Amino acid sequence: MARKPKAATGGKTVTTLTHDEAKRRNIPTAEFVSVLEPEEERPLELRYPRNRDLDPQLVWRGKDEQDWSDLVVHVPPLYIQEKVHPKALIDDLLRETKERAHEAGEVTPDLFADFNGMPKDADKTEFYQHDQNWTNRMILGDSLQVMASLAEREGLRGKVQCIYFDPPYGIKFNSNFQWSTTSRDVKDGNAGHITREPEQVKAFRDTWRDGIHSYLTYLRDRLTVARDLLTESGSIFVQIGDENVHRVRALLEDVFGDESFVAQIATKTSGGSTGVYLSGVIDYVLWFAKNGEHTKYRSLFGTKGLGEDAADKYSRVRLHNLETRSLTPAERALEADLPNGARVYRQDNITSQSVGRDKGEGAASWFPVEIAGQEIRPSIKVRWKTNELGMQRLLAASRVELTSNSLSYVRFLDDFSATTINNSWTDIGGIQSRADPKVYVVQTPTTLIQRCILMATDPGDLVLDPTCGSGTTATVAEQWGRRWITIDTSRVALALARARIMGARYPYYLLADSRDGQMKEGEVARTAPSSQPTHGNIRHGFVYERVPHITLKSIANNAEIDVIWEQWQRTLEPLREKLNAALKTTWQEWEIPREPDPKWPDGATKLHADWWQARVRRQKEIDASIAAKAEYEYLYDKPYEDRRRVRVAGPFTVESLSPHRMLAVGEDGDLVDTAAEASAQYAATQAFPQMILENLKTAGVQQAHRDDRIAFTALHPWPGDLVCGEGRYLEGDAEKRAAIFIGPEFGTVQRADLVAAAREAGDAGFDVLVACAFNYEAHTTEFAKLGRLPVLKARMNADLHMAADLKNTGKGNLFVIFGEPDIDLLTDSDGRHRVKVNGVDLFKPQTGEVVSDGADGIACWFIDTDYNEESFFVRHAYFLGANDPYGSLRTTLKAEIDPDAWATLHGDTSRPFPKPRSGRIAVKVINHLGDEVMKVFRVA
């Protein structure tokens, strides 16, 4: 541990959970893409056979044509972009606090030293050949391809226990996505709010152009691949609104089979949708199993107390002296206290209509019962719920009461002070509470996902979310000790989710496989603690609270009741006989009055008191036996917590389908990301560059600020080899000429391409080169100028392919330049180093200058203080936006980490760090749109 708790101050220990028994395949980092074998880099093709024999089935336009062939999914490899260990960040703050207090900071272990856990003799570049430590995963990309890659390349087929799928509720593109980390205000019809992220727009273009028909195709394809990932006992939960719940349920039955349907759960929305008629306040969660006969299910319970709906039928009370009566209205309304020792109960059914069982005279469990001098038989259509021996024990335990013409079972409220949850979850509130703050435009309440995960999984099981959003599924899975993989097409969503996970605080639940857990289990179960050796294996689960569950069956099978009855009969029967003799009566047990008659002789009064005292004691002993023999229900949502410890998220990786998600540059010329695809092919059809030029003329080139836009006064084709357009814009009052270079529709622009285009532009007398491409190879990033000619690299968004779907208004930021970060490396007097982020260098077309934008446009920035050119480890993290992901941790650890250390998390200057052993550091800067740029420094 980084810091041991002080006995005097009661300091908290910061810890985390790891899944030591679980492994994952060794996959490439973005840095290793250049050494991939060709067969590893080449996308595979995965086929899922269609089921053409479905009857009945949901039909939509285009389904027949799709069913003519199998579902074919291209399976690209995944690349690790970042490795994150949140505990390492907290350990660094603890060390800084120690140093500020002039105490010797404890040497903290390097949590990244064995992050992978690869076998020592294994070649780290032999991808997909070795297993390594499990780390949770946050993946950028189309969920269809990502899930197929997990199944085919990484062997996760049949390994996922639970999938929580929250697809768009309908086909309105804008309302489902968020365009910036700084704003949740997304309006349909606002062109400025339409997301411009390539992965999302591709999903939109491919999905919604044919309305509900495309929507159903989108869902069916992903559900098909998702089913392939599930274990035989696995479950999928699909959250959907009332607009499409009927279609989606039919679609799930097509994919999983109607026999795999488990439940349709109704949940209350945070706000009602208005309409002409009734407002919609209900959303739905559809629960389907991979195999209905083997589904893993853990019951969850709600409370059942007097005054609640679940206890509405509990209308009677038995007092401590065994007298019974109805509850008063004030008692039922909780306006009056019950007498001490009183137990609330209801008169429940003691007969059964079991189908297929014989009933009537001579049938099993059909017999007369003598009670209070009467003989009661069940009707000819029913039978008792127990046999004759069981009925005698129920009578002996005072669990049977005579009603007007039959018998009833006495069911106490505390027999089972909980109630199994059903499919109506209207008790789940919204997500604007302090405990569950909203950070994303479409965000699911934590409690909703928590219930689903707890019902269908155990600690250590794997949970997958194909639609990450704000990361709620990952947050819940992390809290409850489940492994998780979350996927999204939005870089904004993943930026928010990453910050949320990095700064989250979780309770530390007692592991069953720990010494503290063994001690707690012994205490709760009232047994001697286990002496078995412990290993901290989370798959053994937690130590849970539990409630007794007394049933009619457990009482009927409790043979100890017979023994207790016989023992007390030896006391009660002589007293009854003496009482009858004194009063010259022949009372049976049930006829003895509760209160004595004042006219009785003193001897009879004492016998009466002794008899009732023994009778009450017998009842208490029988009740104690019933409670001791009762089964228990575990409360899986209430594990015992060790409040001396604080838990942060375990290690996780940030990954993507493409190795070119970030642009990496080295100030000293050394390169971070040597990823490169084959040479870009520029044999694009004339239609593609022509379409790009048309949009470029209308939209211009946007930088971080709205004012910093290159607005072209004219733009025409140019007959060059690489330069294909000539644009004119104003710099002050002077007109300038821009050469337009357009990269391939599919592929990556390399440095050599930019150099050649810049030379061509310089020879032709242009004032600036504007390169437009979907991806830039890492060598290009530090190439910003060739002689006098500035080179601007604009990233094109993939919605340029969808002119028919998104109107070209010129306001969509189709061509965006996220400039190179302006970073200073500082050296302190003690030889340690700091990094200062000044902002982002941007080209101002109005003046022709390159200026620093300042830090306002930066959402967060990370440092790998010992960059080994193999992986980017997030060793320092700083958040410059308005959100504070460490808010809850700051409150919990206010005694362990001082305010000055916390304040460093929001600065533009890093905390000091020693000279890296590798001789290099890497700095990654992320803006509010999710764009990432990385820069490498050689530290002498």
Model regions and ranges:
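N-terminal auxiliary segments of SAM/dcSAM-dependent transferases
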Residues: 303-416
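S-adenosyl-L-methionine-dependent nucleic acid methyltransferase catalytic domains
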Residues: 1-325, 371, 396-399, 403-940
